[in-house]
């Protein structure tokens, strides 16, 4: 069976950025990577009551002893807590875990209807609350499309409705071009913990194509990606070519009809003038003969 690559990792440095931003010696790489895993796990464990409100966790390191954590959420107030109590507790917890200075920032999601992770979290939360998965999926689909999404695909899998055999259910609307690298595809995955087992939710959200962006290649060279020609432009160019061909054919026809450097109409007009001139001359000659006689 064909498998799908993660849409985010496929587009890193094309129209997506890294979620962990740091660079260290290769000897420290595994330790730093493990710290990133611990940071994300501890934050989600601490905020398990509002885990469905977390879209992403970004980690930035400018030096080995300082870590900046950015929590992306559509509800900053619930993450911050009363007078910043949650942030303070999270900072103390992470400092104890990794023994480094922690700085926590909050980034708000302005349009949660166009965030694939938030959509997946919302569906998982409603499925946990025993809502009808068909209604939930169709409602999420219509809401996102009305808010401006160009395409959306949602897939849910597991023991749906408490069935004995696990199966999957999928809804889709619009375009979701997963093989187009310039397409801005947002991807989200969440799990619903039900009495029948875990139900997985996957969301692919197409926000449009990103054109004219400068990116770094694997060799570090800057490449200016030129916009691809749209279908409308191709049709216009095709019509223009047809018009040019028709004009060329008409011109060729006029050239074939020319006689002594004149067009057919001009030749006909000249013949008429010659005929009328000769007719008037014959008439004048006959009048002179009558007068002389």
Curated annotation (Swiss-Prot):
Q: Which GO-annotated molecular functions does the record name? A: mRNA binding; rRNA binding; structural constituent of ribosome
Q: InterPro entries from the xrefs?
A: KH_dom, KH_dom-like_a/b, KH_dom_type_2, KH_sf_prok-type, Ribosomal_S3_C_sf, Ribosomal_uS3_bac-typ, Ribosomal_uS3_C, Ribosomal_uS3_CS
KH type-2 domain boundaries: 39-110
Q: Which Pfam families match?
A: KH_2, Ribosomal_S3_C
Enumerate the Gene Ontology biological process terms.
Answer: translation
Report the GO terms under cellular component: cytosolic small ribosomal subunit
Query: Which keywords has UniProt assigned to this entry?
Result: Ribonucleoprotein, Ribosomal protein, RNA-binding, rRNA-binding
Q: What does this protein do?
A: Binds the lower part of the 30S subunit head. Binds mRNA in the 70S ribosome, positioning it for translation.
* Protein family according to the UniProt entry: Belongs to the universal ribosomal protein uS3 family.
Subunit organization? Part of the 30S ribosomal subunit. Forms a tight complex with proteins S10 and S14.
Its name, as the record gives it, is Small ribosomal subunit protein uS3
Species this chain originates from: Borreliella burgdorferi (strain ATCC 35210 / DSM 4680 / CIP 102532 / B31) (Borrelia burgdorferi)
